[in-house]
From Swiss-Prot:
Required for the formation of a threonylcarbamoyl group on adenosine at position 37 (t(6)A37) in tRNAs that read codons beginning with adenine. Is a component of the KEOPS complex that is probably involved in the transfer of the threonylcarbamoyl moiety of threonylcarbamoyl-AMP (TC-AMP) to the N6 group of A37. The Kae1 domain likely plays a direct catalytic role in this reaction. The Bud32 domain probably displays kinase activity that regulates Kae1 function. PANTHER family: TRNA N6-ADENOSINE THREONYLCARBAMOYLTRANSFERASE. Residues 335-534 form the Protein kinase domain. The active site is at 451 (proton acceptor). CDD domains: ASKHA_NBD_Kae1_arch_bac. The keyword Nucleotide-binding applies. This is Probable bifunctional tRNA threonylcarbamoyladenosine biosynthesis protein. The lineage of its organism: Archaea, Methanobacteriati, Methanobacteriota, Methanomada group, Methanobacteria. Gene3D superfamilies: 3.30.420.40, Phosphorylase Kinase, domain 1, Transferase(Phosphotransferase) domain 1. It is found in: Cytoplasm. Its EC number is 2.3.1.234, 2.7.11.1. SUPFAM superfamilies: Actin-like ATPase domain, Protein kinase-like (PK-like). In the N-terminal section; belongs to the KAE1 / TsaD family. InterPro entries: ATPase_NBD, Bud32, Gcp-like_dom, KAE1/TsaD, Kae1_archaea_euk, Kinase-like_dom_sf, Peptidase_M22_CS, Prot_kinase_dom.
Length: 534
C-alpha cells in the first residue's frame, strides 16, 4: 500500500509517497520565503493552498504512480500554526474522500524521529529535535516518546531567525549565521542557560542583540551565538543520554543540517562511546515523506481515523501519542573499565583518600565546547558545587562529605554515597513526601539544586542524600524554586509516567510543610511558557 503524506505545520509545504516497507518513492517540497519579517500564519496557509495540489501531482509523477494507486492519506495534525494546519487537514480530507481511502493524522515531531530511525537504522535513540518551532530532547519509555528536556521559551531555530531578522540578515537565519560564524575572529561571552535538561534561549538572544547595538561584529556574534546555543543543546542531550543509559543519539529537525552542531554532537557521542545518527539533509527539514512513513506506522498499529477525528491540534505534545511499534532496547552504554560512571559533566572514579575509600569526580574537558566556554563552566561549577554541598548540610540536608576540591582542574574528592536511587523507589509515597521536605529545606536556605532527577537523590538507610549540585546556584526567587521542582516533575514523568502524578503530589505536600509559597501556581505558570503545553 502506498501512503501519500502532506506536511504543512509552518512555512514549508511538503508531499511524499512511501510504501509499507519504508521505501521513499518521492519527496517534493516548497518553502515560503517572506519578503520581510517572519512567517505570518495566514500567508503560510495561502502558500499551502497554492502548492499542495501542484506538489501532489509532482510527487505522483516522480514515483511513477497514478493518484488512484494511493491507498492511504496521512497529514500533519500538529503542532504548528493553526491556519496552516487547517489548510493541510482540509486538503487531506478532500483527497481521502475523493479517492475513497483511509486517512490518519499524525504528530509532526514524531514524524521527524521516525524518518530519522528509518533512514539511519537507529533503533532506540535519545533524539535531539531542533527546528524553527521546536527544541526537545526525546527518548522512548513506557509506550511513548517522553520529553526529557526542552526549551522553556523560544526554539533554537526561532532564536537564530529572530537574530537574523533584527540584524538585517534575512530569513531563514540559520544558514546565514552558520556562514558568518566561519569568518569570526573572537568569542563574545553570552548567557549560558541550562536548567536540568531544559534550556532557555531568550536571554542569549537579548544579550546578542544588545552586543550588536553596541558595535560588536556580526561575524563574532554569529560565532558566539552558535557556540553558546549549540553547547547548551549538546549538554542537555548528554544529560538525557547519561540518565537513560541508551547507546544511540539521533539528531533531527531543520537545524540538524548545521555542520557545527552535527560535529559537536558527534564529538560528544564519541566521548560517551555511543552511536551518532543523523538522517540525510533532505529528511532533516519538514517534509512529506516523514508524514507518509509515520502514517504507515500509525495505520498498521492503530488503524484509520474517523473523519470527525481529523481535527488539528496546534499544541500537540510529543508525549501525548502512543507508539506501539517501538521497543526499548536492552543495549546500554559500555564504559571503559576504569570509569565507575559517566555523567553529563564528569567521569566518576573510585579511589583512596588518606586510606579511606572515596569517589573522584573529574569534570573533564569537553571536546565539543570551545575553551572559552569549557574552562569557565568546569571551574565555576566545581567551585559552586563545593559551596552548595557544604551549605546544604547547614540547612539540615544530607550531602556527600567533601575531602578535597581542585576548581581549576575541575576535580572533587568526596565520600561514596551507596544506596538506592530515588528513581528506583518512586512508589514509596512516604519517601516522596520526605524528599519534598528536604527540597523545601534547601530552598528555604536559598539553595537551588539545579538538576533534581531521580538519579541525584539517593536513599541511604533512612536518609535522603542529594548529590550532583553541578547546575546549582544560590537564589531565593520563587521562579528558580519552581524551575527546580519542575525539573524533578519532568524527570518523574519521563521514566515513571504512571506513578509520576501521585509521587509529585506527595513531593509538593512535603515541600509545603517547609515553604509556604504557592509553588504549584508558579510551576503551572512556568509550564505554560513552554512549547506546546496546555
Amino acid at each position: 500500500m502506498l501512503c501519500l503524506g502532506i506536511e504543512g505545520t509552518a512555512e514549508k509545504t511538503g508531499v511524499g509517497i512511501v510504501d509499507e516497507a519504508g521505501n521513499v518513492l518521492s519527496l517534493r517540497g516548497k518553502p515560503l520565503i517572506p519578503e520581510k519579517g517572519g512567517i505570518h500564519p495566514r500567508e503560510a496557509a495561502e502558500h499551502h493552498a497554492k502548492w499542495i495540489p501542484r506538489l501532489i501531482a509532482e510527487a505522483c509523477r516522480d514515483a511513477g504512480v497514478e493518484l488512484g494507486e494511493i491507498g492511504l492519506i496521512s497529514f500533519s495534525r500538529g503542532p504548528g500554526l493553526g491556519p496552516a494546519l487547517r489548510t493541510v487537514a482540509t486538503a487531506a480530507r478532500t483527497l481521502a474522500l475523493s479517492l475513497d481511502v483511509p486517512i490518519v493524522g499524525v504528530n509532526h515531531c514524531i514524524g521527524h524521529i521516525e524518518i530519522g530511525r528509518l533512514t539511519t537504522g537507529a533503533s532506540d535513540p535519545v533524539s535531539l529535535y531542533v527546528s524553527g518551532g521546536n527544541t526537545q530532547v526525546i527518548a522512548f519509555n513506557e509506550g511513548r516518546y517522553r520529553v526529557f528536556g526542552e526549551t522553556l521559551d523560544i526554539a533554537v531555530g526561532n532564536m537564530l531567525d529572530q537574530f537574523a531578522r533584527e540584524s538585517g540578515l534575512g530569513h531563514p537565519g540559520g544558514p546565514v549565521i552558520e556562514q558568518l560564524a566561519l569568518k569570526a575572529s573572537e568569542y563574545i561571552e553570552l548567557p549560558y542557560s541550562v536548567k536540568g535538561m531544559d534550556i532557555s534561549f531568550s536571554g542569549l538572544l537579548t544579550a546578542a542583540l544588545r552586543k550588536m547595538e553596541a558595535g560588536a561584529s556580526l561575524e563574532d556574534l554569529a560565532y558566539s551565538i552558535q557556540e553558546t546555543a549549540f553547547s547548551m543543546l549538546v549538554e542537555v542531550t548528554e544529560r538525557a543520554l547519561a540518565y537513560t543509559e541508551k547507546n544511540q543519539v539521533l539528531l533531527c529537525g531543520g537545524v540538524a543540517v548545521n555542520r557545527r552542531l552535527r560535529d559537536m554532537l558527534r564529538e560528544m557521542c564519541q566521548e560517551h562511546h555511543v552511536e551518532f545518527h543523523m538522517p540525510p539533509p533532505e529528511y532533516c527539514g519538514d517534509n512529506g515523506a516523514m508524514i507518509a512513513w509515520l502514517g504507515q506506522l500509525v495505520y498498521k498499529y492503530r488503524g484509520p481515523d474517523a473523519l470527525e477525528d481529523t481535527t488539528v491540534v496546534q499544541r500537540y505534545r510529543t508525549d501525548e501519542v502512543d507508539v506501539p511499534w517501538m521497543r526499548e532496547s536492552e543495549a546500554g552504554i559500555e564504559l571503559p573499565p576504569d570509569i565507575l560512571a559517566k555523567g553529563a559533566e564528569a567521569n566518576i572514579y573510585r579511589g583512596q583518600w588518606i586510606g579511606r575509600p572515596c569517589i573522584i569526580k573529574e569534570r573533564i574537558s569537553k571536546g565539543y565546547r570551545i575553551p572559552e566556554i569549557d574552562q569557565k563552566l568546569r571551574s565555576s561549577r566545581t567551585r559552586r558545587e563545593a559551596r552548595l554541598i557544604n551549605q546544604a548540610k547547614g540547612a539540615g540536608v544530607h550531602t556527600p562529605v567533601l575531602f578535597d576540591v581542585d576548581p581549576d582542574g575541575g576535580v572533587m574528592v568526596m565520600e561514596e554515597v551507596r544506596g538506592t536511587p530515588f528513581r528506583d523507589a518512586v512508589e514509596d509515597t512516604e519517601l516522596c513526601s520526605r524528599i519534598g521536605e528536604a527540597i523545601g529545606r534547601l530552598h528555604h536556605a536559598g539553595i537551588i539544586h539545579g538538576d533534581l532527577t531521580g538519579s541525584n537523590i539517593i536513599i541511604r538507610g533512612g536518609d535522603v542524600v542529594f548529590i550532583d549540585f553541578g547546575l546549582g546556584r544560590f537564589s531565593d526567587e520563587i521562579e528558580d524554586m519552581g524551575v527546580d521542582l519542575l525539573v524533578l516533575k519532568k524527570s518523574l514523568e519521563s521514566t515513571h509516567y504512571a506513578l509520576a502524578g501521585e509521587c509529585f503530589s506527595r513531593v509538593l505536600e512535603g515541600y509545603g510543610k517547609i515553604i509556604d509559597a504557592d509553588i504549584q501556581s508558579k510551576i503551572r505558570e512556568i509550564e505554560s511558557r513552554g512549547r506546546y503545553t496546555d
